[in-house]
Amino acid sequence: MKLKNIKIEERMEHYNVNGLSIALFEEGQIRGTVNYGLLEVNSDRKVNDDSIFSACSISKFLTGIIAIKLLEEGHLDLDENVNERLVTWKVPENEYTKNKKVTLRNLLSHQSGIKDPEGSFLELNSDIGFPSMVELLEGKSHYCKVPIEVQFEPESEFHYSDAGYCILQQLIEDVTKKQFYQVVNEFIFEPLGMKNSQLNTTMSEVDRDNFSCGHNKNGELVDGKHPIYPYPAASGLWTTSLDLAELVLELMNAVKGKSKLGISESLAKEMITPQRGKSWTGLGVFLEGSEKELEITSLGWGVGFQCMMVAHPHLEKGAVIMTNAELGVHQLEGIIGEIYKSLLS
């Protein structure tokens, strides 16, 4: 993938985007990065290869990789009722779970029958602090005031769900007996050398010099500068375009039987296979096209940030695009979409 027929700095000015980072990869290797602009408006902090952005919901792709790794090691089962392994909290049984159960497969593919309550899963309120996953799932927190339960028969409908990934986080913590960020460090960040990546549960302990601030569609700083989402598995990842590219490459290499994490070729292929008749959703990723033209994507959109990862596993190419601007429109309708189209041209 190469950038063609686009003047990025001109487009950044058009969209009021302060900072942007792109990593390009091909044939199993990172081919280069390009960085533009500033980490914070009206500062002298320039975006570089070590600049850290909020990946927002691309965190779900990371969680998908962890789940598949734990599945490979026998800690999880793809089609087993998750209540068999959940300890701290369990999915409430009701009329919708009589015939089909909530499983790892349908949680990862947003088909568990769970729908996020309106107005839930917003950014951290520093006066209230971090909720526990149990408080969230029981509807006993500011961030989710309604208990999470199955509202449709599992695998009957698709509903994009942060709550589903909170259940996945609790499941991962229960089976490993470790905090989620510890599992991520041990199973993902350290083996892949993702030294500039971390989850928001550890944000208070870091030097934020390399961290980008979030900005609104007018290019102005958002409140708090670094919006945090207290749901690490759903939206807690802070990372660089380079580190995120390493994670995407891990999946692409695993599909060819060359995983650094020990993920089998068969399970890697299952991640990028349409699930339960829904052509657009795999396990932790979204899909477009088929066979050699298959495209996998993951999008992030939160307060002050938008980003995208795109990969063509069979053509062995892809890109990560990270910005510190929330434009108020879908990624493909703003500067990320223009860059994406440039890469495909």
Regions found by a protein language model. Name each.
Residues 44, 150, 225-229:
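Acidic/His metal-coordination segments adjacent to aromatic residues that form catalytic metal sites
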Residues 63-64, 164-169, 245-246:
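Well-ordered alpha-helical segments within folded domains of soluble proteins
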Residues 125-134, 142-152, 157-160, 171-178, ...:
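Recognition helices and adjacent regulatory flanks at domain boundaries
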Residues 1-38, 50, 84, 119, ...:
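Catalytic loop of the DD-peptidase/beta-lactamase superfamily, centered on the K-T-G motif
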Residues 57-58, 159-162:
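Catalytic nucleophile serine of serine hydrolases
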Residues 48-53, 152-157, 233:
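A short glycine/serine-rich beta->alpha loop
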Residues 5, 49, 54-58, 70-120, ...:
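Active-site helix/loop module of the DD-peptidase/beta-lactamase fold
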Residues 62, 99, 163, 180, ...:
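A generic structural signal for residues located within well-ordered alpha-helices
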